[in-house]
Every structure is written in structure tokens, then in C-alpha cells.
Amino acid sequence: MSRSKKILFVMPRLPFPATSGRKTSLYHYCRILSEELGYKLIVAAFLEKGDDPNLKPKFIDRLEILPKPTSVTKIKNILFDSVLLKRKPMQVSLYWNPEAKKIIDTLVDEENPDIIIGDMVRSTEYIRDYNAFRVADLDDRISLRYQRQLDYDITGINPYGAFLNTLPKMIQKIMLWKPLKVYVVKNEIKLLRHYELEISEQCDKTIFVAQQEADI
């Protein structure tokens, strides 16, 4: 396949080094797309703690680091999009940054990718409005995972993600208060169910790890 074919991969973390289960999957996913299928691979990713862009493997042709939203932006996103308007789950609101979208817009203009992939539900909001062939790689349905955990033991659920650790201890305790957390999780499940179906309809393809996730 000619290297003129391009894929833009939008990710919530770097796909390297292959030090965890998801990173290992992403690493080989990218390697196969580049080395075996011959695509020029452009990656736009946020950084997680410990990520080092200097370790970029050769099969990634271009890497752009996306700026995470500030705490103020996250709070605004949650209040307006998840609580008041109820149009986005917190999984999406916590990763939405207009500055990151501008970078992705520039990448699309410069590279004109044939395919754009959004990794996990938190990245798919960035790819929904392009003319390229769009793939939502959701891995699993978080709404189902949360529902199973809610039915079994809510103590294992943190709907706020790493954002919780950026807040004062007193606020953390309030947000983890069981009645409040049950309400938040139930609302998040409802928003995720709607969003997962909506993004699946808007993208050209949707990928799940297990067939039963797609069947439900």
C-alpha cells in the first residue's frame, strides 16, 4: 500500500512505550497500520503521567501533543455539558479542550488524512465533524461497565477519573459520598448510553473488543 495513504489517530495517551495492557494494544495497532499496511501514521495524543514523547517509535511519522483542559475548563465542561445540558458524559467533558481541537483541525488541514480514528469515548468528540472516514474505537461500552459495577459494588467506581485527585481533600470526600456518587454514576451511565449510540451513528465504523458489546 502506498505511503500516500494517511491515518490520523487521536488518543487520550501516548501509544508508547508498551508498558501496560492498553498501551501495548495501541503500540502494535499503530505498528501494524504503519509497517504492515503501509499507512503514514499521524498521532495526536494527550500526555499521561510518565509519558515521554522523545520515545516515539519510527513507525509514527508525526506526533502532536494535545494540551489538556485546565481545571477551570473541566469544571465548566462538567457543569454545562454534563450537569445542566446533559449532552455529554463526564468521560467526554473531562477531556474536551477547544485548544486541542484547533491543533487537530490544523493537522487535518495539513495532512488531509484518509482515515481518522478516535481512541476510547473520550477522544471521539474530536473526530465527529470531519469528512474523512471516521472510526470510533470504543474498546468497550463504559456504560455497561459502570452498570455492572453499580449493580455489584459502587466503591470500585470513580466517575471523576484523575480529575478527582486535583481537588482539595474535603471536596474529594464530598464527591465520593456514596449517595452523591450513586446519583453521579447513574447520570453518567444514562449520558454514556446515549453518547455511545450517537457517536456510533455519526462515525463510519465503530470498534469493540468483544462482540457482545456491539450486540447490546
Model-derived regions: residue spans:
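N-terminal subdomain of nucleotide-sugar transferases
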Residues: M1-L66, D109-E110
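Structural motif
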Residues: K6, D114-I115, F133, K205
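Active-site proximal beta-strand in glycosyltransferases
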Residues: I7, Y130-M175
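Extended catalytic core of nucleotide-activated donor transferases of GT-like folds
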Residues: M11-R13, S25-H28, D51, I65-K74, ...
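Residues in the short beta-alpha loop(s) of Rossmann-like NAD(P)-binding domains
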Residues: L47-K49, D140, Q212
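Conserved nucleotide-sugar donor-binding subdomain of glycosyltransferases
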Residues: K76-T124, D129, Q172-S200
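Helix-loop-beta element that forms the nucleotide-linked donor phosphate-binding surface
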Residues: Y130-N131, E201-Q202, I207-V209, A214-I216
